[in-house]
């Protein structure tokens, strides 16, 4: 389980096909504190650590995850929102996030709104009815409040802190994000 509060902005170090896809991710986490078998949310999906070294860890990504998330489009150098699994007794600053992505949403617009940016998304039709005004969504693993809903579309506001510490700082119209 996760909170949707990103604690590191990692970078894909390498991608290798070995049956499943092995992805190495650079991180500022102290990898001495990461156990093999630990769960880390990587831009939304919960992935299992299978290897690690100083400043990086590796995960294996199944064909199912590649097909149903944005991870199939990752390349070396891509930025990745990272969150370690929550621990009992820690602050729940976002909302409860499972790391089981429901689908992929596409950014249809991004416009300034005060000091934030309003991102509008198009959600998969079979999932859109579950998105509620003032409810919570996790987009690329980031816990956000839904500020508008219309048809299959919904909007969220991204404050400057979120832009600076997540991949929302580089996302643009046409980009796709993992939706939970």
Model-found features: residue ranges?
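Conserved loop->alpha-helix
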Residues: 1-180
